[in-house]
Amino acid sequence: MAEQREDRRDGRGGHEGAPEGATEGVREGARPRGSGAGEEEARAWDVLVATARRTVADGLVVGTSGNVSVRTGDIVLVTPSGVPYDRLTPADLTAVDLDGRQVRGTLVPTSELPMHLAVYRHTDARAVVHTHAVHATAVSTLVAELPLIHYMAAALGGPVRVAPYATYGTEELAENMLRALDGRSGCLLQNHGTITYGATLDQAYDRTAQLEWMCRLWLTASSVAGLTPTLLSEGRLDEVAQRLRGYGQRS
């Protein structure tokens, strides 16, 4: 979702768009960085901010749209609602528990918190990236599943599904997303954008970038008049999945 663009760090912003229960303890019990956040959380916050800024620099979001989170233990650090990423500082650390109760910071968490928490509750994710990437969002309006235009769909677990549309920030959207993510590490959100997860923020981000690239590839190939793109079979994709298990450097 495109977060509200009002910079709420002065504490005067309301809680519009935050999920029920997410703002409990914002004034009482929620602690800013330095009065509860340990070194691990501080480092994780720095990486989260860098990743959020990267989504803007790489054109995956505009303004304050999209959101990023990372899990440390049973705490989820998440981008706040409506604050431009280039203005986020160490003092802006925002975190909730797995029930959505705010435990760090005074800024209102992203309105898409239900999606992030649903991913953490139902998968082994340690990081989540949600964007409004242009080509991926365009594809989400055209098909129910991204056609198998490239073998790197295997890196996301198989053919990428499109979660049916639901209003941003709702449990309905989170439920639709979970169904689309079954057996996958990423999906498209109809008329909305992308969501991916991984063991690290780098992995989640790379999956987002790969998904956007595949969507751009399919749109480009299918735009050629009189020709139809060659697609891969799921059997071919399974072969790639096997090879990817041994891909890269090993320690």
Question: Which residues does each PLM region occupy?
Answer:
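Glycine-rich flexible loops
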Residues: 2-11, 20, 24-251
